[in-house]
Amino acid sequence: MKLTKMDQRILNQIQHNSRISNQDLAQKIGLSASPCLRRVRQLEQEGYIDSYIARLNEQKLKLKLIALIQISMDRHTPERFENFEGIVKHYEEVLECFLITGQNADYLLKVIVPDMEYYQDFLLGKLTRIEGVTGVQSSFIMRKVIDKTALPLAHL
């Protein structure tokens, strides 16, 4: 499926407000309600719309410490990577995990926890106990400068 300009407008509206009603969406993009709903359903079926989620307030939930953690592994084998990834994907504190290159690390994790004491327990009780982890370097977020979830669509 090739995305049309109308599809791009739909995606742009939905990624900024996933709770928008079909009627409001249709009005904003200049389409009647039925064709708008058909297009949204098609975008969902084609996988362009992955999910609809609520973005929770970290501060209200007392999640005040965000860490970017570089992880070094002892061996660069598919089995070692599969083991690590299989374990960290179950840690609710891990928001994102990237296999990286160009650094002295193999993985970059984005982790959110309530405080430094919790972070220490997470680091020593979970991360460093994973087989193959040989190094951990943490950086802590002082302030979010840009915090958005909307993907750029202008290139389409």
Feature map (PLM): residue ranges:
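A compositional/biophysical signature of low hydrophobicity enriched in polar/charged and small residues
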Residues: 1-156
